[in-house]
Amino acid sequence: MICTVYKSRRKLDTYLFVEKRDDFSSVPEALMTMFGPPQLVMLVPLSKRTSLAMADIEKVRSELKDKGYYLQLPPPKANLLEEHKLSLGIDKYAP
């Protein structure tokens, strides 16, 4: 299976995987509106890959099969202040 990967011009580090190039018929209209005009990034031969950089390849395959698309969102940003407080033993809910 070869899938097509597009990046969002509106949302940083957000990617949309679809089964066929320029076929967004299975992607909900609301998602396409938020995603904005898709910019082609690459074609990926999923059948020949064992992993992907930022996504679980089995989840990508499964969602492409079930929904016809896979949306890759950016990883959550680390809250360095909260991590530092935790390392010092400071409870973030303490008054």
From Swiss-Prot:
It holds the Pfam family YcgL. Residues 1-85 form the YcgL domain. It comes from the Bacteria. SUPFAM superfamilies: YcgL-like (SSF160191). PANTHER family: PROTEIN YCGL. This is YcgL domain-containing protein Sden_1630. It comes from Shewanella denitrificans (strain OS217 / ATCC BAA-1090 / DSM 15013). The lineage of its organism: Bacteria, Pseudomonadati, Pseudomonadota, Gammaproteobacteria, Alteromonadales.
